[in-house]
């Protein structure tokens, strides 16, 4: 179960946070456009729900952090059940062809994560690899590998295990490498929901190519309305491409010119015909 599409569930999850059933319906439809794998679609939909769920989390209340974490993980288990119920109604034929061993796979993983939560940090990461290896039936050696049952638990651990602040939380997961682009999106979204706009360092918020567009889209998700003044996505991509080109020019290597050496003149005793043989060719 690949984790490539997990972040696609975030917009619908945030936009319909007051109507989670609608969010489930939309995200299952989005998931079915990208995959036929039950775990991938469940993960995509759960990712969107968790983004909206973290908005309700009180980041300053560290004394109650463990209790809040257990509640969130329990809510995630229940939400996985709702996703699979709706999936069964939406795509009954696909549900019937999905092996029974894959039913409830993500729900059971979240449940086991909740039960294992109090063990050491490194032991918990090792458990993530072991659990994913057994369920995906492939050898997994790093929790940052690109599978649903590795990246989702890993990002939950990074975000909820300790309240370090937005910058430290995001830096921690990016430093783990592997699928850093995917974990960065998940942790960045969830940590952003917890710490809010002002929890992001000013130096990170300033200088973004599409900073204004990102902000007004975030405001649009919060207000459940698409901003009319937002640029088309093509314009945003074009602006980013031009910025990358301008930055790249500063660090591009200058072309080096190669000058051919001046050929040495033939000296007086170096007759060009000196090496020609007077022996006649064999006829």
Residue ranges and their predicted role:
Residues 1-163, 171, 208-283:
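Phosphate-rich cofactor/ligand-interacting catalytic cores and adjacent structured alpha/beta frameworks
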Residues 143-205:
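Glycine-rich, charge-dense phosphate/pyrophosphate-binding loop(s)
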């Amino acid at each position: 179960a690949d984790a490539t599409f997990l972040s696609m569930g975030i917009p619908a999850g945030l936009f319909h946070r007051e109507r989670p059933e609608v969010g489930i319906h939309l995200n299952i439809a989005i998931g079915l456009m990208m995959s036929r794998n039950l775990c991938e679609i469940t993960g995509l939909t759960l990712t969107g729900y968790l983004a909206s769920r973290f908005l309700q989390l009180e980041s300053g209340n560290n004394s109650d952090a463990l209790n809040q974490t257990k509640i969130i993980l329990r809510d995630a288990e229940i939400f996985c059940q709702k996703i699979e119920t709706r999936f069964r109604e939406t795509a009954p034929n696909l549900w019937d062809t999905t092996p029974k061993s894959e039913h409830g796979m993500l729900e059971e993983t979240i449940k086991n994560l909740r039960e294992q939560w109090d063990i050491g940090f490194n032991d918990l990461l090792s458990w993530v690899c072991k659990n994913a290896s057994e369920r995906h039936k492939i050898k997994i050696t790093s929790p940052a590998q690109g599978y649903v049952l590795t990246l989702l638990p890993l990002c939950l651990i990074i975000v909820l295990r300790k309240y370090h602040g937005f910058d430290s939380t995001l830096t921690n997961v990016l430093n783990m490498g592997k699928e850093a682009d995917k974990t960065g999106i998940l942790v960045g979204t969830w940590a952003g929901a917890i710490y809010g706009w002002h929890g992001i360092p000013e130096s990170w918020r300033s200088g973004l190519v599409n900073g204004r567009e990102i902000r007004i889209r975030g405001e649009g998700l919060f207000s459940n309305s698409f901003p009319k003044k937002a640029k088309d996505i093509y314009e945003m991509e074009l602006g980013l491409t031009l910025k990358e080109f301008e930055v790249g020019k500063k660090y591009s290597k200058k072309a080096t010119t190669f000058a051919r050496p001046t050929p040495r003149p033939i000296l007086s005793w170096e007759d060009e015909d000196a090496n020609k043989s007077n022996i006649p060719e064999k006829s």
